[in-house]
């Protein structure tokens, strides 16, 4: 059995699927309770407040039990929750030397490099890696085990396919200094070479050579990256660090 408390070697679709299957499912909730309730400390339950007002934080079944036991003492209560039977917690981002904007969803077992930028609405799945100085723009999706190099821009709404469902033995790899336009899709197992540019809206189904520009559905090479392209696709360092 996988030890879910260690840094498991989640390098393929089947290991990740087993990790998810064996993980203890969680429905954490927060309850605001008005009333002089009787509640004792127990594992998995945090209690805050005063004599006639309590905030309870814990698993749904534990909090519901407290509310049911005190229903005659409760004037009213409000329950907050944002997930149900979740298998993977969110990443603890407090230690990261990166910019993480509100609304980004980053699951556990993700690696994020120094000065990376994760914008609002971006979703980064388990096992993904984001390199230094890279930006994951608004509503972009980085699938499970997706590998993003350094100084990469993944445009708004772009999708980097993961290794899960359909299972893939090879993750998507975006090498350093790549620019991916808005709403582009990079399919399973594709490698985008260093310095390449993927035009907005493209669907990339095969490897992209370094320093080339691809566009279209499916994406095809349209030219080699030149100075004009470099100027149009350069990163803004002021947005990082």
UniProtKB/Swiss-Prot annotation:
CDD domains in UniProt: LbH_THP_succinylT
Entry keyword set: Acyltransferase, Amino-acid biosynthesis, Diaminopimelate biosynthesis, Lysine biosynthesis, Repeat, Transferase
Catalysed reactions, as listed in the record: (S)-2,3,4,5-tetrahydrodipicolinate + acetyl-CoA + H2O = L-2-acetamido-6-oxoheptanedioate + CoA
GO biological process assignments: diaminopimelate biosynthetic process; lysine biosynthetic process via diaminopimelate
Transmembrane segments: none
UniProt keyword annotation of Acyltransferase present: yes
EC numbers for this chain: 2.3.1.89
HAMAP family for the chain: DapH
Its biological purpose: Catalyzes the transfer of an acetyl group from acetyl-CoA to tetrahydrodipicolinate.
Family of this protein: Belongs to the transferase hexapeptide repeat family. DapH subfamily.
Annotated protein name in UniProt: 2,3,4,5-tetrahydropyridine-2,6-dicarboxylate N-acetyltransferase
Organism listed in the record: Caldanaerobacter subterraneus subsp. tengcongensis (strain DSM 15242 / JCM 11007 / NBRC 100824 / MB4) (Thermoanaerobacter tengcongensis)
Taxonomic lineage of the native organism: Bacteria, Bacillati, Bacillota, Clostridia, Thermoanaerobacterales
Encoding gene per record: dapH
């Amino acid at each position: 059995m996988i030890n879910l408390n260690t840094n498991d070697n989640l390098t393929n679709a089947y290991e990740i699927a087993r990790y998810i299957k064996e993980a203890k499912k969680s429905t954490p909730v927060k309850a605001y309770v008005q009333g002089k309730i009787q509640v004792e400390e127990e594992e998995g339950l945090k209690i805050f407040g005063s004599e006639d007002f309590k905030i309870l934080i814990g698993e749904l079944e534990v909090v519901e039990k407290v509310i049911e036991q005190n229903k005659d003492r409760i004037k009213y209560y409000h329950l907050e929750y944002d997930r149900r039977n979740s298998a993977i917690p969110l990443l603890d981002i407090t230690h990261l030397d990166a910019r993480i904007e509100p609304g980004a969803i980053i699951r556990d077992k993700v690696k994020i490099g120094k000065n990376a930028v994760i914008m609002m609405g971006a979703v980064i799945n388990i096992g993904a890696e984001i390199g230094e100085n890279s930006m994951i723009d608004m509503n972009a999706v980085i699938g499970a085990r997706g590998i993003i190099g350094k100084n990469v821009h993944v445009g708004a709404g772009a999708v980097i396919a993961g290794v899960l469902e359909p299972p893939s033995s090879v993750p998507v790899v975006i090498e350093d200094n790549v620019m991916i336009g808005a709403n582009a899709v990079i399919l399973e197992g594709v490698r985008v070479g260093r310095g390449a540019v993927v035009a907005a809206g493209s669907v990339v189904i095969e490897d992209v050579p370094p320093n080339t520009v691809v566009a279209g559905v499916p994406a095809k090479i349209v030219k080699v990256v030149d100075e004009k392209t470099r100027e149009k696709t350069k990163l803004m360092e002021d947005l990082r660090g």
